[in-house]
A protein has these predicted regions:
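Structured, mid-chain assembly/scaffold modules that mediate subunit interfaces
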Residues: 36-183
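N-terminal-proximal low-complexity accessory segments that begin disordered
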Residues: 1-65
Length: 183
């Protein structure tokens, strides 16, 4: 085999490999069971924040720490598991469900992607997340010659991701066969 970069080895076949992995996860009972087991072991029925802060950095005495931690954990729980799902920009999942979905994507595709959003809500918290299918991260034709962009990820000179090109719709979506990219 030819010695080449990991991107060169993987990116050309990424879509086919991911499609096969998703098909396997949907149609193979053993894989489906392993996926469910992974989600259950990592998250369980509900994600629970177990905060252990450094009290001196917060300017708190050790005696004050327990009350502060309890307050933070209760607020997190109210935000994360709100029945109206304000943690999800689409308002369809709780935080635990989003984490379980991310574990599933990571298990099948080796990656998961969430966009942090700011959206006013009745819950009192405006931070929410938008789940994005990893295959929607893609390089548009208009910038395909830009060497700082690979597979829709724009990187700085050190390789740190500084931006993403996201298809507004999945390329195989039923609603349309055309899609736009958003940076």
């Amino acid at each position: 085999p030819v010695l080449q970069s990991a991107d060169r080895d993987m990116l050309g076949e990424k879509a086919v490999t991911e499609a096969r992995a998703q098909d396997l996860a949907r149609n193979n009972g053993f894989i489906k069971g392993a996926l469910q087991n992974a989600k259950d072991r990592v998250v369980g029925a509900q994600f629970k924040l177990q905060h252990r802060p450094r009290h001196k950095m917060l300017g708190l005495e050790l005696s004050q720490l327990s009350a502060w931690v309890s307050n933070v954990e209760q607020r997190f729980q109210a935000w994360a598991e709100d029945p109206d799902c304000y943690v999800d920009a689409r308002r369809q999942m709780t935080f635990s469900q989003m984490i379980r979905e991310a574990i599933g994507q990571n298990f099948i595709q080796g990656e998961s992607f969430h966009s942090r959003e700011w959206k006013q809500s009745k819950s009192g918290f405006s931070t929410c997340f938008l789940s994005v299918e990893p295959e929607r991260i893609d390089t548009p034709q208009s910038v395909s010659m830009d060497e700082s962009i690979r597979a829709g990820i724009k990187s700085d000179k050190y390789g740190e991701a500084i931006g993403y090109w996201v298809k507004t719709r999945h390329s195989r979506d039923i609603a349309t066969n055309q899609y736009n990219e958003k940076y």
